[in-house]
Amino acid sequence: MRTVCYGKRERLTFGRIHDAVKVPNLISIQIDSYKDFLENGLIEVLKKFSPITSQPHKGDLKKGEKGFVLEFVSTKVGQPNAPVEECKQKGLTYTVPVYTTVRITDVNTGEMREEEAFLGSIPHMTENGTFIINGAERVIVSQLVRAPGVYFVDEIPKTQVVSPIYVAHFLPVRGAWLELLYYSADNMFYARIDRKRRINLFLLFKALGFTDDLEILDLFPDPIDADDEYTMEKAVGSIILHDVVLDGKKIVERGGVLTKAASQAILESKIATVVRAHPAAQKTLEKMVDTYGEVDSSKAYVEIFRKLKPGEIPRVNTAKAYLTSLYFSTERFELSDVGRYKINKRLTQAYRRYLAQVKGLPEEEVESVEYNPEDPVLTPMDIVLASRYLLDVSKNPEIMDTKDHLGNKRVRTVGELIKLEFERAFARAQRLIQERLTLYASLDKISIQSLINVKTIIAGINQFFATSPLSQFMEQVNPLAELTHKRRLTAVGPGGLKRERARFEVRDVHHSHYGRMCPIETPEGANIGLITSLAVYANIDKFGFLTTPYRKVVNGVVTSEIVYLTADEEEHYNIAPCTIKIDKDGRILDERVPVRFMERLQFVEKNKVQFMDVSTKQIVSVSTSLIPFLEHDDANRALMGSNMQRQAVPLVKPEAPFVATGVEYDAALYSGYVVQAKYSGRVKKVDSRKIVIERMDENGKPVLKNGKPVLDEYRLMKFMRTNQDTTVNQRPIVDIGDIVKAGDVIADGPATDMGELALGKNVLVAFMPWEGYNFEDAILVSEELLEEDTFTSIHIEVYETQARDTRLGPEEITVDIPNVSKEALRNLDENGIVRVGAYVGPQDILVGKVTPKGEGETTPEEKIIRSVFGERGKDVKDTSLRLPHGTDGRVIDVKVFDKDEETDLGAGVNKLVKVYVACRKTLEVGDKLAGRHGNKGVVSKILPKEDMPFLPDGTPVQLVLSPLGVPSRMNVGQILETHLGWLAKLTRNWFATPVFDGAKENEILPWLYEERRAVGLEEGDSDNEPSGKVVLRDGRTGESFAEPIVVGYIYMMKLVHIAKDKIHARSTGPYSLIHQQPLGGKAQFGGQRFGEMEVWALEAHGAAHTLNEMLTIKSDDIKGRNEVYKAILKGKNIPEPGIPESFRVLIKELRGLALDIRVYDENGNEIDIDRV
């Protein structure tokens, strides 16, 4: 066991393996991608549209025709429009202006001019990897999509189940698909163009320029054994590709058909092999000739066009242009760098075989040849190689592609997604540029800025940020939730999968996920397996493929060289886990070692190992790597543990876990909520709002500038609100005089303690039943936790109101509110806005506001009253901002934005007031608590601490958990954590137990027993077989319980599902406009729906009158409910209910369908439904 320093805290670690690689920057996936977009992506898009040429100016022909060419040279990014905090407060978008240098040339004169033009302001990423859009913090989630390229798969035909169809799919980034098909049952080749009808493959070959039939057959040679009688007999009728010479005489010429006699002669001779055309190729050619006769390229084009567009008249030029535009022109078809790279990689093996078999090159010469055309479109050779490779696939289906392999998927990160959007927006602007260029006659009259339509570009990008499913409102419950959101991968969204159609195989864990995507962290429900998280060390290469690091192993010795491999590259190597035994020089000690090879696990000799994992936490995500003893938890519960840590509310007094994994420090660091020193120095001044550090050099001497010491000031965030209404509050953890190094943590943020992530509290728990109060995972809680404010959290809500211009005059924010008591105005200042520090409850006025009502002519008397009493005399409506039902708290901040001072408040808004109310929420019955192992429960009872079970030394336990929550859930990690947590408390140590390399039971229990014995707490346990159990006594009676009980410290978190936020009651409230039924939901102050099943319940009990009331006067009988109200006020009997409004709505809807609906009473008299 060794001591490791995590931030400002030292921990004893049980980890035996030293990580070969430090945890990388966990949000670099966002930051690097966006940076690349600004530096390279912008100019790449502009260069794609460059040059833009004008149409010739149709002027006086004598003066010569004018033409201009516009090119984009470079781009430049300006400074952000406002600080991040200001954008959040004022509801602005945090943007940067983008400029481009444009070169415009007059084609006739060669005259040239360069000018800088403004392209628009685009949302800019903050240093934490987020965007501020209209004041709200958002994240662009990375998308996992099928990589373009060529895929070899099999399809089972609908007609027969016996022989599959082998398909080569060419998948572009943009453009039509091309599918080459080999029907093994018919032994025929076909092609399917743009997912339409299939055509003969060789028809496509003819169009591609293979004019001679024999030339096509040459591409599919099939050497056969000339000594084998059976083979030669079957080969009769085959077309021979090479002359067969016997005793200087040609028996069969090239292109001839092998006869029975020739076959017999060859058998009797010493000829070893005969090269014939592959039967599938011969049959395909014969079928083409049978169907179309002699085919040249023109005829091929026409026939293909006829199949693809049956309604149109086929002309050679049209047909040729159409096919060329589909696959061989960059205008309508694009493979992209990734697609070309994937095709080249996939077809290299086929290319080598082509060179050897068709071109006759020697094997050793071919082995090192790579297939590397650089065309952004398909080439004839791609199609030839793919169709040849189909024959190999049919013989060896193992070499087929699986769609779910990560080598066939790539990640579209922020930069690429914005680049695609920018490209779409600029394509629209480009057409306008072209049109506007034609309007100018000379170069000096052209204003480049006026050519570019900035609005089109900005609108496109803003729409993406505001409405795309990949632009998401950031989860900010705690720092981990934010970090995980930035590292999320989604397979759904534009260009991705549909949630409803996603098969089980897509969602499942695949062996290629190892070290790239977490197999544990994914939502429960409809999105399971579609939304995942990046593994801790995963990286993204230049093509967007996920890579993971490995240590290179040479001759059984582990080197320090780190290699990043994609899922495809990894397939060819034996990779050992990092838990194998090695000595201090890196030599592997065991002769045979377990390794991963493709999807298999096998044992190999140590000198056959090529790579080794870099860390035990390599396969999991950040959230999952925070679970101690993960190796003892069932995957389903670990999934819940990972997800629930993201829902933990930051507490008033954060406390790091006694039992950690060592990742807490990195998670807190990259979440962006802790403050790091940028330079080394000495702390000069500290208070709650700022830290001042005097900068020092390596020798410890102050750094001077103009003879004065350089001071670095770090401002802290105090009680800021997050997207989910939790609190961000930073606290300094350094003192005056402390020496700090660059990179040290100097201030904690929310849910961090001494630089480590601290999502919950260490509490003393006992696993035992207690009077049924822990039935169904409920939790019994000691009042001590309330007294100590253990699980108290602060939540900040913002309430805002606008004073707008209305048709009847402007709204006014004022303290003069009609019909309101002085008591209700006690917390408002002279402007009608609540004062900071006031305690407010439900329905209290936060901002007084009046709206003008419609009014007729005013009499002279009214004018006098107005002049005397001011606004009070005016006919106005009270539209004040009030605190909603069920909330209370203290006003901690008020922000007022006035139209005169602010330019961007929006049209018709004169004033905007935001009131921030902080609410302190202590633990209550109904709150949800959870550990890190998926062990969740609801507080069922809060018991006085004197009634709680207590230890032999009198210490009462703080939580009582159900022991039945462990065996069937198979999350035994919580029991080991309980033991180690108690050991931490007794020894005053902080422990780290890394995932898959943690403490063993025999390391904890004997040590725990020794420590307990030292303080007299060994009762209930024995020396020879320590169990970690202790005798507890009942707090109410003082008697000991029958059996010893597992007691210890567990790290528990309070989740964001707080009972106080969910509880809701309605007396009288709003009704829906059309149906006149009460609204639903807490937000609308709605009622509880009395649904179908509830009606059945009342029917079953014969409660007819109650049911009648429920469906009429308590719901949508307008007249009836008003009458009942009057009757109750006057103390009269309740009248009979009338007709529900929903019945009238139904009749009106049926009449809207042109049905004549009439209502009659029991005597057959027609009733006018509108008058009843």
Swiss-Prot record:
GO terms for cellular component: DNA-directed RNA polymerase complex. PROSITE patterns: RNA_POL_BETA. SUPFAM superfamilies: beta and beta-prime subunits of DNA dependent RNA-polymerase. One of its GO terms (biological process) is DNA-templated transcription. It catalyses: RNA(n) + a ribonucleoside 5'-triphosphate = RNA(n+1) + diphosphate. Pfam families: RNA_pol_Rpb2_1 (PF04563), RNA_pol_Rpb2_2 (PF04561), RNA_pol_Rpb2_3 (PF04565), RNA_pol_Rpb2_45 (PF10385), RNA_pol_Rpb2_6 (PF00562), RNA_pol_Rpb2_7 (PF04560). Gene3D superfamilies: 2.40.50.100, 2.40.50.150, 3.90.1100.10, DNA-directed RNA polymerase, beta subunit, external 1 domain, DNA-directed RNA polymerase, subunit 2, domain 6, RNA polymerase alpha subunit dimerisation domain, RNA polymerase Rpb2, domain 2. One of its GO terms (molecular function) is DNA binding. InterPro entries: DNA-dir_RNA_pol_bsu_ext_1_sf, DNA-dir_RNA_pol_bsu_external_1, DNA-dir_RNA_pol_su2, DNA-dir_RNAP_su2_dom, DNA-dir_RNAP_su2_hyb_sf, RNA_pol_bsu_bac, RNA_pol_bsu_CS, RNA_pol_bsu_protrusion. Keywords: DNA-directed RNA polymerase, Nucleotidyltransferase, Transcription, Transferase. Its EC number is 2.7.7.6. NCBIfam families: PRK00405.1, rpoB. Belongs to the RNA polymerase beta chain family. HAMAP family: RNApol_bact_RpoB. The RNAP catalytic core consists of 2 alpha, 1 beta, 1 beta' and 1 omega subunit. When a sigma factor is associated with the core the holoenzyme is formed, which can initiate transcription. DNA-dependent RNA polymerase catalyzes the transcription of DNA into RNA using the four ribonucleoside triphosphates as substrates. PANTHER family: DNA-DIRECTED RNA POLYMERASE I SUBUNIT 2. This is DNA-directed RNA polymerase subunit beta. It comes from Pseudothermotoga lettingae (strain ATCC BAA-301 / DSM 14385 / NBRC 107922 / TMO) (Thermotoga lettingae). The gene is rpoB.
